[in-house]
Amino acid sequence: MTTIYISSKQAHNFDDYTINKIGVPSSVLMERAALAVCQRLLESRNFNLKKVLVVAGIGNNGGDGIAVARMLYLKQVPVKIYLLGDREKISKDSRIQLKIAENYGVPFVSNIDDLSSYTTIVDAVFGVGLSRDVTGEIAGIVDFINNSPASVMAVDMPTGLNADNGNIMGTAVKAAETVTMSYNKLGLISETGRKFAGVVTVADIGIYEP
């Protein structure tokens, strides 16, 4: 695959083309994304998987994270999920992932007031689609994550980092590594983006440009 850097709009358009024109189900892309993140977590020396927390939003980025948690759980990795947001408003594909995780018995936590015991945190709150500043409860969670001793893996983009220019949208997760899907993002190659994304892996999950 040719190395190119894309914007959030291009990422959306490429997703739409792959799903609606090519016919690859969005759920398949979500599984591939989660598998790429899971594999990187298992192979990287930056992560101690003694105790893992996946912080998942209610959009598709969160669905990726929930699937990561399930894959780790099935490999006997001690992992829990914190779902950030109203589960009644969760996206369609993420709802499917949530049900699968529950059926497998992946444990959930209702609060994350104490992150000191976790060795790895997976940031799956917001991906490339973030268009507003991170505030309120989510900003508080970002601060919790950044102040924890855990190493952080970001899914697609660190939460709070603008995918187009790397600007911080209010506040942002500082990750040790980021697995971004199919194409690198413009925001990840900016000075700030590199600082907050850490080591970037571009995972080929089968999304292509029109």
UniProtKB/Swiss-Prot annotation:
(6S)-NADPHX binds at residues 60-64, 127-133, 156. Catalyzes the epimerization of the S- and R-forms of NAD(P)HX, a damaged form of NAD(P)H that is a result of enzymatic or heat-dependent hydration. This is a prerequisite for the S-specific NAD(P)H-hydrate dehydratase to allow the repair of both epimers of NAD(P)HX. Keywords: Isomerase, Metal-binding, NAD, NADP, Nucleotide-binding, Potassium. Belongs to the NnrE/AIBP family. It holds the Pfam family YjeF_N. K(+) binds at residues 61, 123, 159. HAMAP family: NADHX_epimerase. It catalyses: (6R)-NADHX = (6S)-NADHX; (6R)-NADPHX = (6S)-NADPHX. One of its GO terms (molecular function) is nucleotide binding. It comes from the Bacteria. Binds 1 potassium ion per subunit. It comes from Oenococcus oeni (strain ATCC BAA-331 / PSU-1). This is NAD(P)H-hydrate epimerase.
